[in-house]
Structure formats: structure tokens, C-alpha cells
Regions:
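Short, extreme N-terminal segment that most often corresponds to the first beta-strand
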Residues: 1-26
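Short acidic DE-rich linear segments
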Residues: 124-127
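Acidic, low-complexity, intrinsically disordered interaction modules
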Residues: 22-121
Length: 127
């Protein structure tokens, strides 16, 4: 793998935004559309490589903290590399998208106008 997991998460989000500028989406739904409608990685061997590169214990800790805070309990099977990695990507994607002030402050509860996708992309590329 040439890109780090975090770089690939960023690239996934930015590519999605570029490819879907004409889509009517609420800002608050964008994270779900990008990171929860398809799997980031499907093969267990690839999932293991990503987790080793990121740090398995760091991934477990991040997922546990996120799920306990947001759901009150841990529901992801932390022994399954596929489930662990895809939940980690979901969390990293949320953290990354939160770097866009336009997305989180202006269009969170509104449809994102087509011309604002470029602004969001520019903000995210600076991260």
C-alpha cells in the first residue's frame, strides 16, 4: 500500500465529492453516503494490512471509545479485521469531514448547493 489509511480515507471523501457534485444531499447525510453505504475494504488480508499499518491496538481503542461515547456500548466485533477496519474508516471519515466549516456550519441541516461542493473540497484538501 502506498497511501496510508488516513490518506486513503481523505482521498475517498474528496473523490466522492468530486463525482457527486450534482447530487442533492443534506450536509448531515454526506458522511453516511460516503462511508456507510459501501465497504472500504472487503478482503480480510487487505484489512489486516491496513490495521497493521495503522496500529491494531490504536484501531481497537479508537473504535471502542467512539462506540461507547456514541452508542453506550461496543457493538463492532473487534476480533474481525473486516468489521474493525470498516468501522475505523467510518470514524476517520467522520473526523475528516468535520474539518469543513462550510459543511458542518452552513449546510449541515440543508441541501448542499452544487457550487458549494468545490468549497468543501478545497477546505478538505487543506487538511
Amino acid at each position: 500500500m502506498t497511501l496510508t489509511l488516513i490518506e486513503e480515507v481523505k482521498e475517498t471523501a474528496i473523490d466522492y465529492l468530486k463525482d457527486n457534485e450534482c447530487m442533492n444531499t443534506y450536509g448531515c447525510d454526506l458522511h453516511n453516503e460516503i462511508f456507510n453505504t459501501d465497504y472500504f475494504c472487503c478482503y480480510t488480508s487487505d484489512c489486516k494490512k491496513y490495521l497493521e499499518e495503522y496500529g491494531v491496538f490504536e484501531a481497537v481503542e479508537k473504535v471502542q471509545e467512539y462506540e461507547k461515547f456514541n452508542f453506550g456500548e461496543v457493538t463492532t466485533d473487534l476480533s474481525d479485521p473486516f468489521k474493525l477496519l470498516n468501522m475505523l474508516v467510518y470514524i476517520l471519515g467522520e473526523e475528516f469531514l468535520n474539518n469543513s466549516n462550510t459543511l458542518t456550519n452552513t449546510y449541515w441541516n440543508e441541501y448542499i448547493p452544487e457550487n458549494e461542493y468545490k468549497t468543501i473540497i478545497e477546505e478538505l484538501q487543506e487538511v
